[in-house]
């Protein structure tokens, strides 16, 4: 039997990889072999960073809460401990949003935390 080189199937497969590599610099968006390696590495970065995003947002929320808490003369850790003692179940995402958009509500929560800490 004669050898079959792949023809349209190979071309389609390579075109797909080159299309995924659009926007890459240098040979990485032109040459199939290099483009394939870079696309695979890009998938690895994407997989890793989808998980990293969660911790990055948590760090951002904590930084925002801490900044707003210190304006109200309390540290982040004491605020969180006070809220726990006061049985206030507000997550960090909501606290950070309150700290930015509704300072009065955030101050009320800080006062609750301070009362709970004083009663301890």
UniProtKB/Swiss-Prot annotation:
Which GO molecular-function terms appear in the entry?
Answer: rRNA binding; structural constituent of ribosome
User: Cross-referenced CDD domains, in alphabetical order?
Assistant: Ribosomal_L20 (cd07026)
Q: Which UniProt keywords apply?
A: Ribonucleoprotein, Ribosomal protein, RNA-binding, rRNA-binding
GO cellular component terms, semicolon-separated: ribonucleoprotein complex; ribosome
Q: Does Mitochondrion appear among the keywords? A: no
UniProt-listed GO biological process terms = ribosomal large subunit assembly; translation
Highest taxon listed in the record's lineage: Bacteria
Transmembrane feature ranges? none
Task: Name the Gene3D superfamilies for this protein.
Answer: 6.10.160.10, Ribosomal protein L20 (1.10.1900.20)
UniProt keyword Transmembrane, yes or no: no
Matches recorded under NCBIfam families = rplT_bact (TIGR01032)
Family label: Belongs to the bacterial ribosomal protein bL20 family.
Q: What does this protein do?
A: Binds directly to 23S ribosomal RNA and is necessary for the in vitro assembly process of the 50S ribosomal subunit. It is not involved in the protein synthesizing functions of that subunit.
| Name of the molecule in the record | Large ribosomal subunit protein bL20
């Amino acid at each position: 039997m004669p050898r079959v080189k792949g023809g349209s199937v190979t071309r389609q497969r390579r075109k797909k990889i080159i299309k995924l590599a659009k926007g890459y610099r240098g040979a990485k968006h032109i040459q199939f072999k290099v483009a394939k390696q870079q696309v695979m590495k890009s998938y690895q970065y994407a997989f890793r960073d989808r998980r990293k995003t969660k911790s990055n947002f948590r760090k951002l929320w904590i930084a925002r809460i801490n900044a707003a808490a210190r304006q109200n003369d309390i540290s982040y850790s004491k605020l969180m401990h006070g809220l726990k003692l006061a049985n206030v179940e507000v997550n960090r995402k909501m606290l950070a949003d309150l700290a930015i958009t509704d300072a009065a509500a955030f101050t009320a929560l800080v006062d609750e935390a301070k009362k709970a800490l004083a009663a301890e």
